[in-house]
């Protein structure tokens, strides 16, 4: 008789491009987002939590490829009784949902509408080292104001946010540019062909990777990339490419010099002059608020996303050095970007609604804080009340209740209490600072044993026998003094 086939078991593994987050990481992110929300709230922004799912129609141009709605996003088509239904997708960012929310509820919302949003977004793109298909974003936007004061405020708020979470002044800079200035440069170049203009924009977007010489080559005939492959250029002459390079390299020693260089780059272009005037206005507003060039600067080399924004753009760059995976020094780089996009709601209402906002890369900012030592890499676990007699579980629950009521994180060991060594191993794996022990003898004498697990580990690793005798890591105290002694040990550990 043939043996019945075993039911195949599913593989216990995360899908490609996704990962799990455990205790300390989740706590660190939560605490950082709480600090950021505090800054946003202080600036008068209100929280918004929108659906993780939107219709593909609502996502619209925010998708990388509108002709293939399931490309770049996680999308599916609803089935209806009368046939195929709407295409739905997990949100690609937090901006597209804002456009839909404002268009849908604009009659009930104040104008301008100032909102912040935090949460995961999903992108169906090829994953790589440090690049996941689900990640957190933290956005703040002002919808309904065309004033440059809104842009200046976003820049100031971004600066305050970085300092609040632990990036000191001098270790970051918020850099500001304007898409209109680039439009003026393109106008000066006399590029009428839309395809060629788009090619120039894509080339400029690579400035931070290939530098001035690389952009010059890509604007011309082309260049060899790092792999040796030849990348075709835009095909501009040196004279045509000149204004672009002048624009990218126009930052001077101070704001006045930068502005003068930009005016030379845009010539008589009205749109270019308007963009420069807006930059000057933003600079004046920031200076009035006490935000000097040690925090926020006008920098025409900020070019990422210029094809998307319609006016001012800004980027927060961390300037301190770290070591990459090959041991080479490099700057940490950008952790946030944003800008003005005045066609945000137009696709829903047919009316242009001005808007400006910023998005913080949560995981990158967390990584930066770890590099600066601003976040504990290992979170302290709970105090563990061990179980010496399973029939006395009520007594142990009373102990843990006293600790919790005193504001101390604590738990009773709920595994098999037969092996006391396993209980201490559990406490070690939880990174617990203290273990509480009460066996039959302690119960009879009205005392408890309190073990300082942090000090005990340090003594075991470094102390001599004499030092170990002089510095005991286990204390016997009266049962009534349990909370006071635990609090004392935790305070000493906190230093």
From Swiss-Prot:
Source organism, top-level taxon: Bacteria
EC number(s) on file: 6.1.1.21
UniProt-listed SUPFAM superfamilies: Class II aaRS ABD-related, Class II aaRS and biotin synthetases
Keyword Cytoplasm found: yes
Gene Ontology CC annotations of this record: cytoplasm
Localization, UniProt: Cytoplasm
Reactions the enzyme catalyzes: tRNA(His) + L-histidine + ATP = L-histidyl-tRNA(His) + AMP + diphosphate + H(+)
BP terms from Gene Ontology: histidyl-tRNA aminoacylation
PROSITE patterns, sorted: AA_TRNA_LIGASE_II
Keywords, ordered alphabetically: Aminoacyl-tRNA synthetase, ATP-binding, Cytoplasm, Ligase, Nucleotide-binding, Protein biosynthesis
Residues in coiled coil: none
One function term, GO molecular function aspect: ATP binding
InterPro entries, per the entry: aa-tRNA-synth_II, aa-tRNA-synth_II/BPL/LPL, Anticodon-bd, Anticodon-bd_dom_sf, His-tRNA-ligase, HisRS-like_core, HisRS/HisZ, HisRS_anticodon
UniProt KW Acetylation keyword: no
HAMAP family: His_tRNA_synth (MF_00127)
Protein name (database record): Histidine--tRNA ligase
Record family assignment: Belongs to the class-II aminoacyl-tRNA synthetase family.
Oligomer status and interactors: Homodimer.
């Amino acid at each position: 008789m043939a043996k019945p086939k075993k039911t195949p078991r599913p593989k216990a593994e995360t899908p490609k491009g996704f990962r799990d987050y455990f205790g300390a990481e989740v706590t660190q992110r939560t605490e950082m987002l709480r600090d950021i929300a505090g800054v946003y709230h202080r600036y008068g922004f209100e929280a918004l939590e929108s659906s993780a799912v939107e219709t593909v129609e609502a996502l619209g141009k925010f998708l990388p490829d509108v002709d293939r709605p399931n490309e770049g996003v996680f999308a599916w088509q609803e089935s209806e009784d009368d046939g195929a239904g709407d295409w739905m997708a997990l949100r690609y960012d937090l901006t597209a949902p804002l456009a839909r929310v404002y268009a849908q509820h604009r009659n009930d919302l104040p104008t301008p509408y100032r909102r912040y949003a935090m949460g995961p977004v999903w992108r169906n793109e090829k994953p790589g080292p440090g690049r996941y298909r689900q990640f957190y974003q933290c956005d703040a936007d002002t919808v309904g104001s065309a004033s440059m004061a809104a842009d200046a405020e976003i820049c100031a708020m971004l600066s305050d946010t970085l300092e609040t979470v632990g990036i000191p002044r001098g270790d970051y800079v918020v850099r500001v540019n304007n898409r209109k200035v680039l439009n003026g440069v393109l106008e000066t170049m006399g590029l009428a062909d839309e395809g060629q203009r788009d090619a120039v924009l894509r080339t400029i977007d690579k400035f931070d990777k290939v530098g001035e010489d690389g952009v010059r080559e890509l604007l011309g005939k082309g260049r060899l990339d790092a792999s040796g492959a030849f990348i075709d250029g835009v095909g501009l002459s040196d004279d045509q490419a000149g204004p672009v390079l002048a624009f990218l390299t126009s930052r001077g020693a101070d704001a006045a010099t930068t502005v003068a260089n930009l005016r030379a780059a845009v010539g008589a272009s009205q749109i270019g002059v308007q963009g420069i005037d807006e930059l000057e206005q933003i600079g004046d507003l920031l200076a009035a608020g006490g935000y000097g060039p040690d925090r926020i600067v006008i920098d025409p080399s900020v070019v990422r996303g210029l094809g998307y924004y319609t006016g001012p753009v800004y980027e927060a760059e961390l300037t301190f050095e770290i070591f990459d995976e090959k041991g080479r020094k490099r700057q940490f780089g950008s952790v946030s970007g944003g800008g003005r996009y005045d066609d945000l709601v137009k696709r829903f209402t047919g009316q242009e609604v001005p808007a400006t906002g910023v998005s913080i890369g949560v995981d990158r900012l967390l990584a930066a804080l770890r590099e600066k030592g601003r976040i504990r890499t290992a979170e302290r676990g709970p105090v563990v009340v061990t179980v010496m007699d399973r029939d006395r579980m009520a007594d142990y629950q009373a102990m843990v209740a006293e600790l919790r009521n005193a504001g101390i994180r604590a738990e009773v060991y709920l595994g098999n209490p037969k092996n006391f060594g396993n209980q201490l191993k559990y406490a070690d794996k939880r990174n617990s600072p203290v273990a509480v022990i009460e066996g039959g003898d302690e119960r009879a004498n009205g005392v408890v044993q309190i073990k300082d697990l942090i000090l005990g580990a340090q003594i075991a690793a470094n102390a001599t026998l004499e030092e170990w005798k002089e510095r005991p890591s286990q204390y016997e105290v009266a049962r009534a003094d349990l909370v006071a002694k635990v609090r004392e040990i935790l305070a000493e550990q906190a230093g």
